[in-house]
Amino acid sequence: MAIVEIDSLDFPGVELFSSLTEKQLRHSYEKGNGVFIVESPKVIDRALIEGYEPLALLCEQRHVVGDAAEIISRCGDIPVYTGSRELLASLTGYVLTRGVLCAMRRPAELSVEEVCRDARRVVVIDGVVDATNVGAMFRSAAALGIDAVLMTRTSCDPLNRRAVRVSMGAVFSIPWTWIDCPVSDLNRYGFRTAAMALTDNSVSIDDAALLAEPRLAIVMGNEGDGLPAATIAAADYVVRIPMARGIDSLNVAAAAAVAFWQLR
């Protein structure tokens, strides 16, 4: 490894951590699969365990021989850019979580067939745009026995920096990919689909037939608008979570956790 002391915001080599947007990162780095940013030693550790390739580290000076020392030792021959807490916060636009960031190469995109081949329970995240919600849903999915996650392209990228951090690295341990036509694609692979929505014909989440399905895809919609009407109409089930005290809905990440637990 090479420890490189930076002394300015335009220091050569640090543009991955400063000037590139999330979209630019996805399409950067020699026309490969792109790059994403991971923060905190614990989450970087999860990524390394799952085989993700580190490209560069950005680390506060005090953490080089502290919290980040083990991570640095495991990342091989990559540059480790270091500077003061204040300089790095100015460079990135935020205070580094636990003082360290890692730029990593995005993996090759999996096919829907690869992700679903051995799965029994999957979730479709359809149009969920908030990174915190996506990260929380991945963490719940991994913890509560969901086998795979399928994302529509209107959803937030699961490898968004904040989504990765909120998931605590769960995005690295559960298979996921993008999907274009959730209901028809999943029906073709032998799944019945359960759209989480409030409609006149919705069934309770504890419905016996629903629970007995051998392969089930739970479809979660946008934070404000929910699922598209066409998706609801095409689903095999429309499912509601019974609630009390006149409450008719939950935050999408909270609703997803309830659904994952009940339908596992």
Please name every model-derived segment:
Residues G66-D77, A230-T231:
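Short, aromatic/basic amphipathic alpha-helical patches
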